[in-house]
Curated annotation (Swiss-Prot):
The gene is SSNA1. GO terms for biological process: axon arborization; axon extension; axonogenesis; cell division; intraciliary transport; microtubule cytoskeleton organization; microtubule nucleation; receptor clustering. Residues 13-70 form a coiled coil. Belongs to the SSNA1 family. It is found in: Nucleus; Cytoplasm, Cytoskeleton, Microtubule organizing center, Centrosome; Cytoplasm, Cytoskeleton, Microtubule organizing center, Centrosome, Centriole; Midbody. Microtubule-binding protein which stabilizes dynamic microtubules by slowing growth and shrinkage at both plus and minus ends and serves as a sensor of microtubule damage, protecting microtubules from the microtubule-severing enzyme SPAST. Induces microtubule branching which is mediated by the formation of long SSNA1 fibrils which guide microtubule protofilaments to split apart from the mother microtubule and form daughter microtubules. Plays a role in axon outgrowth and branching. Required for cell division. Its main location: nucleus. One of its GO terms (cellular component) is ciliary basal body. Keywords: Acetylation, Cell cycle, Cell division, Cell projection, Cilium, Coiled coil, Cytoplasm, Cytoskeleton, Flagellum, Neurogenesis, Nucleus. It comes from Bos taurus. This is Microtubule nucleation factor SSNA1. The modification N-acetylthreonine is found at T2. One of its GO terms (molecular function) is identical protein binding. Self-associates to form fibrils. Also forms dimers as well as monomers. Interacts with SPAST.
């Protein structure tokens, strides 16, 4: 019976040792879970912050693109109006030169005809 008692005591000791090892492994696993949950929370906060920042950047970008489009439209309209002014100025200059030439010819003709009659 003492042998059986000794064997039972050995089994009991081994069982206790195995249970303690399992408890230690469980505690280590709990620490790892806690660390990973903290890391997960940290990453979720970073993602939330980055998402908010991305939304702000997108809003700013949309406003700036709209402003750039307004600049493009204004520049295009101004350039078109300026080209019309240039064309009108060129036409006006041509008409003015032609009329000035006609007036010069008319004045020269009048001077010739009045100069010839008086002589």
């Amino acid at each position: 019976m003492t042998q059986q008692g000794a064997a039972l005591q050995n089994y009991n000791n081994e069982l206790v040792k195995c249970i303690e090892e399992l408890c230690q492994k469980r505690e280590e696993l709990c620490r790892q879970i806690q660390q990973e949950e903290e890391e997960k929370q940290r990453l979720q906060n970073e993602v939330r912050q980055l998402t908010e920042k991305l939304a702000r950047v997108n809003e700013n970008l949309a406003r700036k693109i709209a402003s750039r489009n307004e600049f493009d439209r204004t520049i295009a309209e101004t350039e078109a109006a300026y080209l019309k002014i240039l064309e009108s100025s060129q036409t006006l200059l041509s008409v003015l030169k032609r009329e000035a030439g006609n007036l010069t010819k008319a004045t020269a003709s009048e001077q010739k005809s009045s100069g010839g009659k008086e002589s």
